[in-house]
Amino acid sequence: MLTRRTAIAAAFTTPLGSRVSFGSTRRTLKVMSNANVAGIHVPGNVAVREILQQIGDYAPIDLTRMEKQANITQVLVGGGPDIVDADTPSIAAAANAGANLKIVGQFYASVDLVFAANADVVTSLQDLTKPDVVCGINTPGDTVHALLLGVLMKHGIDITKVNIVALGGSSARMRALMAKRVHLVPIHADQAHDVALQGNYKPLIQPWTEYDFWSNEVWAVNGKWLENPDNQRVVVDVLEAQLRANRSATNDFSWFAGMFRKYSNDRDAAHWPDDRIHDEWTLLTKEIKAFPEPMPLDLAAFNTLIPIYEKAGIVSPGASFDSLIEPRFLAEAQKRLG
């Protein structure tokens, strides 16, 4: 007798090696992603906007961008998009609250954010505990909040003495820093050069030097959606496209430079000179190692983030990534590439 349980089991044993074919029509994937496109986001964007259509039977994607990544996760819980680029903490929080979600790959590895400080006031982590020093973040419980707390915890800083305020998006944070209303804010590494020209602002924290593992953004899907064998093969195709983009970004500066100018939403990106993009490329590929091959999706590594998430109020005590990480599709995509 074929029950729902046995049907699902059969679906997960369906061979994934072949790419999706939809006959006479091409499938239009509904993708949700971060509104910001910095250098670290370029391969993921190229993957679903160009490479996916080259390797499979896909039309141009139906792309929706959102300023707040937590909103992407909320929509995914409701089952709207096919696949999303979401921040890891909000996916963990939703799963902790009972949502059936799956992390199937990383949008990139590590993180390119730095915490820029007003160096007239802050020159060490301990300075952040001074009563008149204020740290600006986007939203309590978001990935930036967790990122900061993890570094403070690592160095034994009393986080109860650190004044952290929510300021919203990057523009608001930068205005507050320049106006000296706050003394530490997160910025993308490719913004550090411009920020330094505005005054005595210096990177205080470079998270990729602090963490052995950090996951900032992931490819995630709704667990119910993933029960469909066709959707499983879609995930493999997306991840293959991501891996191909990662490989090009890492090994071919000219490719990265061209795609950066095409997809970055920095208003001047199209006119960035090669040497400036080369600095960004070197940082991402050599120091941060944002596009590694193979791209890891290791459960034990993800679970090292849980104590930080607990401190940030993202998940409850005893939470884990055990039910969230689904590595089979990434393994199949990597097998395709050899």
Where are these regions (language model features)?
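A generic alpha-helix surface/boundary motif
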Residues: 42, 46, 88, 146, ...
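Predominant activation on well-ordered alpha-helical scaffold segments within soluble catalytic domains
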Residues: 92, 149, 193, 239, ...
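N-terminal secretory signal peptides and thylakoid transit peptides that target proteins
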Residues: 1-14
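Conserved C-terminal helix/tail region of periplasmic/extracytoplasmic solute-binding proteins
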Residues: 302-338
